[in-house]
């Protein structure tokens, strides 16, 4: 069996370290930095010939820098004769640009990034809760999309919830919310019907379902500016919800997210560590982070040993 090696870019070193600790190995020795003109500099400082290599790198903000850093690391390892290279991308940037809207003259950037990674020598991709599952088909290499939402579910099950109801923040999230509701004591589900006049701005229109005197659990794959989430929470409280908890895998938290969450009526926001939090977010008392290091470490172990990934999620 080839020797497993784990390398990390600069996007999410804390999670990479946690994963390495779970696997009882050290992170690979590599120098990943910048030249004086801003170009990315990578040097692999140990032998990787024939090794089964995993690179941990979220393509979060600064998205373009982190993508290029991943690409240059892949090329460095390929030229150093690594046996197999798996890109572990906990958060896959550009995933929301996965289609053309009404024949607009826009790119499908998720496909562009997938083609880029497939063409430069990545043998496999491991990611978490893709914004759209069809993105797996954009790649010309195998993609394992693991479910971080199950880590969130474990936290929900440990809460002392009173008459809970799972809420989808939009129509597109109904499948995700229904799956969580079924696993959460087969509880009821509500849907928030909203209209979005422009990017990152939404208007709550209607709540489908009775949320009065219930603990509401908003579930989504990511939180960006938090505007949608905070307005959803306000609408739920106006309809008589007792408490509102928000769960999301990816804490993008861009723009006015710190201000929005600080001033929101949400009782607690729970996210995973696929993206590092800014200091402004970390200081908020109503934001808590769960680690995916155990799940990702097990997925990496299974890939390296040629074992089933889907078996991790069979109930």
Curated annotation (Swiss-Prot):
The active site is at 194. It is found in: Cytoplasm. GO terms for molecular function: ATP binding; kinase activity; magnesium ion binding; ribose phosphate diphosphokinase activity. Its main location: cytoplasm. Binds 2 Mg(2+) ions per subunit. Mg(2+) 2 binds at residue 170. Its cofactor is Mg(2+). Keywords: ATP-binding, Cytoplasm, Kinase, Magnesium, Metal-binding, Nucleotide biosynthesis, Nucleotide-binding, Transferase. It comes from the Bacteria. The keyword Kinase applies. GO terms for cellular component: cytoplasm; ribose phosphate diphosphokinase complex. D-ribose 5-phosphate binds at residues 196, 220, 224-228. Its EC number is 2.7.6.1. It catalyses: D-ribose 5-phosphate + ATP = 5-phospho-alpha-D-ribose 1-diphosphate + AMP + H(+). InterPro entries: PRib_PP_synth_CS, Pribosyltran_N, PRibTrfase_dom, PRTase-like, Rib-P_diPkinase, Rib-P_diPkinase_bac. Mg(2+) 1 binds at residue 131. Belongs to the ribose-phosphate pyrophosphokinase family. Class I subfamily. HAMAP family: RibP_PPkinase_B. Homohexamer. Involved in the biosynthesis of the central metabolite phospho-alpha-D-ribosyl-1-pyrophosphate (PRPP) via the transfer of pyrophosphoryl group from ATP to 1-hydroxyl of ribose-5-phosphate (Rib-5-P). This is Ribose-phosphate pyrophosphokinase. The gene is prs.
